[in-house]
UniProtKB/Swiss-Prot annotation:
Residues 1-21 form the signal peptide. Negative results: does not influence host total hemocyte count. Does not reduce hemocyte encapsulation in the host. Has no effect on humoral immune system, since it does not influence the activities of prophenoloxidase and phenoloxidase in the hemolymph of larval Diatraea saccharalis. Non-toxic to human cells, Gram-positive or -negative bacteria. In vivo, ingestion of this peptide does not impact larval mortality of both lepidopteran species D.saccharalis and S.frugiperda, which are permissive and non-permissive hosts for C.flavipes, respectively. Keywords: Disulfide bond, Secreted, Signal, Toxin. One of its GO terms (cellular component) is extracellular region. This is Teratocyte protein CftICK-IV. It is found in: Secreted. InterPro entries: Huwentoxin-1 (IPR011696). GO terms for molecular function: ion channel inhibitor activity; toxin activity.
Length: 82
């Protein structure tokens, strides 16, 4: 019984450790870098662009904790304003 419990605890720890890393990699593959927090799903990292006033470039809304690694100037994306 103790062996089964120990195995369960180890598996739980592995899942908790690996899952955020998978999401971070998904962010990276979509051209995003995690600044703070984590992407809550693979899909939402690069959704919701907004213009960043300091850099005059498009940034991912910070609620996902991600920004693009190579931001695009706002003028290039003006027609795609979301």
């Amino acid at each position: 019984m103790a062996k089964i419990l120990l195995t369960f605890i180890i598996l739980t720890c592995l899942i908790v450790t690996i899952t955020p890393a998978v999401y971070d990699y998904a962010c990276y593959k979509k051209g995003c870098s995690k600044i703070q927090g984590r992407c809550s799903t693979n899909a939402d990292c690069c959704d919701g662009y907004q213009c960043h006033p300091q850099t005059a470039s498009w940034q991912v809304v910070q609620k996902n904790g991600c920004y693009p690694i190579n931001p695009v100037p706002c003028s290039q994306l003006q027609q795609k304003n979301v």
